[in-house]
Amino acid sequence: MTAPGVRDGQNAADLDEDRYVEEVLALVNEGNGPARSAGEAPGSREAAAGHHAHPRQDHPGEDRHHEDRPREDRHRATPWAEARTLAGRAARSLAARRPPVSVTLGDALGLVLAAPLTALTDLPSFDSSAMDGWAVSGPGPWAVRDEGVLAGHAEPAPLADGEAVRIATGARVPGGATAVLRSEHGHTDEKGRLHPTREIQHGQDIRPRGQECRRGDQLLPAGAVVTPAVLGLAAAAGYDTLAAVPRPRVEVLVLGDELLTEGRPHDGLIRDALGPMLPPWLRAMGAEIVALRRIGDDAEALHRALTTSPADLIVTTGGTAAGPVDHVHPILRRIGADLLVDGVQVRPGHPMLLARLKPEQHLVGLPGNPLAAVSGLLTLAEPLLRTLAGRAAPEPYTLALRETVHGHPYDTRLVPVVLRGVHAVPLHYNGPAMLRGIAAADALAVVPPGGARAGQEAELLDLPWAAAGIGACSF
């Protein structure tokens, strides 16, 4: 299966887009050796440079550490696909208990209908004109009344046979009218009588009452996502408010004493990249952000935050490993949380976790490295939030990889790619601490253990802005 919207060919109008993508590829792939020429066999440069079949170490510190870990440690981590399934199921019972909310049309965009959308009126609710012209009765020629009929006005007087009246698009059709003659299809003679310039059919250009639906018809089922078009349909059908599944409430806790909130990195301190990135990304997943708090490496502050948060989901950044200031595991044990996923067989992002703090509250612990955190978002947070928001799982799709992607020997890899026609082009700068690749990407390719060769189909995870535009991140 290929990506939605993939084009079979290109024309001159596509050239600007092509040039942009080529510039992106040049920037994101620079510094990683010369690009393979069009006629060069996949992997030939790697072989010439002495790179053999073993996986390339994009982030050697992380991979060496875990490749050397005991086999039983590797097997404690949850396989990637299973982790996504567990995350989606974890919130299923909670989602069923969440009562719907009534929201105005202005606040409903991006929500999911909690009840079917049923027409409150016939659409249209009266016979109306589909065009500017004349409402006519019987065969022509017709005597034209002096007054006209405008949209939004009261019901006009009925027409007698042989009469016509000027009418505007959307106006109520007078009783007795048999058709609407378009302005460009009629003319008046010196006596003021209207003549058609072409044959006119009975009922022509009249929108009959109930043409689109009758009162009580189901227009959309429960579970439909509220798009701009749905808002328009709801308004036309008589709605001021909609019954919707409430947005999951999410609190983001940024951990780490080394993080700066402004300026350039200095003296061993680094900028916090996740604080600006996570809230809009989570909104694109259907969440309402109730708070963003910076906790530092304070265990007691983390404990207070976890035990007082009103959120349905708490997302933490960093602190999920076993270092001297990695407090997430000890605090979860202290509060008696159920650890549902403790490590996932995926790179980057292996030390992510999912815990149930209360029957109605979960925690997703993301690694502190930015791309590893993105991996955790898509692996654990997205399925859980999708379930809470009442959204259906997206239809999986695949594209052929244009280049060989080296794999991890045991774990799935998530690799940033750009979509080029019927191919996914892997991007470099895909180490766990890097954002340069994902910033240029359309999707993440799911690369199985051992890697994938050029031409092999890979499942793709769309990024919110690629699938629905940047506005998807600002609901």
Stretch-by-stretch model annotation:
Residues 166-168, 197, 221, 252-255, ...:
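Short beta-strand segments
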Residues 2-240:
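Phosphate-interaction motifs
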Residues 169, 255-256, 313-331, 338, ...:
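Glycine-rich beta-strand-to-loop/alpha-helix junction loops that act as flexible
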Residues 127-129, 154-160, 173-174, 187-189, ...:
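Solvent-exposed alpha-helices and their adjacent loops that cap or buttress functional pockets
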Residues 205-316:
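Phosphate-binding glycine-rich loops and their immediate beta-loop-alpha structural context
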Residues 101, 105, 128, 194, ...:
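Flexible glycine/proline-rich
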